[in-house]
Design a protein with these regions (language model features):
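AAA+ P-loop NTPase catalytic core and its hallmark functional loops
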Residues: 2-197
Length: 197
């Protein structure tokens, strides 16, 4: 189990900056970034410190309160895609999967809709438009999630992607928690959650 230290806000900020800088280096080497967990009493500025450093680094700051959302909020909305081809069956055939929203546009450009379709998922609204620079994703109340949400979060933490979308290169995930030894309604973390190995 990971060792827990008590730090003040400035120390937390410096530690976060170290992890963020390290994650940029890891991403540059094609390695997965490391998530960091901050545990503290409510009102001790855990989320504020993360937002402050995100603003200083000009990262997109996204905060998800995990006790208030469901797994579908991580997945995104279902969309229907259709397979279309230009010059079908010829050497220069070009085929794409497009959503029903742009199908007419591609047909007008000379593509033919085939009789193939599939269900896909759009990016969740909270990540759309944030592909241009790294994201500092704060998962608040990490130890207050349901088991299903905990599994979804572990995938996101391990892979920096979930189902149909991924975080931009160089992004960092920060988890915030309330202490499990206090009078809060929290879930005990298992060893995989505590160490992120």
């Amino acid at each position: 189990m990971a060792h827990k230290n008590e730090l003040n806000s400035l120390q937390v900020k410096n530690l976060l900056r170290y992890f963020i800088d390290n994650n940029v280096k890891l991403a540059g080497k094609g390695k997965m970034p490391i998530a960091i967990e901050i545990e503290g009493m409510p009102g001790t500025a855990k989320t504020s410190v993360v937002k402050q450093i995100g603003d200083e680094l000009q990262y997109h700051f996204v905060r998800l309160n995990l006790s208030e959302i469901e797994v579908c909020d991580l997945v995104g909305l279902p969309t229907y895609e259709y397979k279309i081809c230009k010059n079908a069956g010829k050497k220069d055939e070009e085929c794409l999967w497009v959503s029903d929203k742009v199908l007419g546009h591609y047909i007008a450009m000379g593509f033919t809709a085939l009789n193939e379709h599939r269900t896909s998922y759009s990016k969740p609204s909270w990540i759309q438009g944030k592909e241009d620079r790294p994201v500092l994703l704060t998962l608040d109340d990490y130890n207050r999630v349901t088991p299903m949400m905990a599994n979804a979060c572990m995938t996101l933490i391990d892979e920096q992607k979930y189902i149909s979308w991924g975080l931009p290169k160089g992004s960092t995930i920060v988890l915030t928690c309330n202490p499990s030894d206090q009078d809060f309604m929290v879930q005990q973390e298992d060893s995989a959650q505590a160490t992120f190995d």
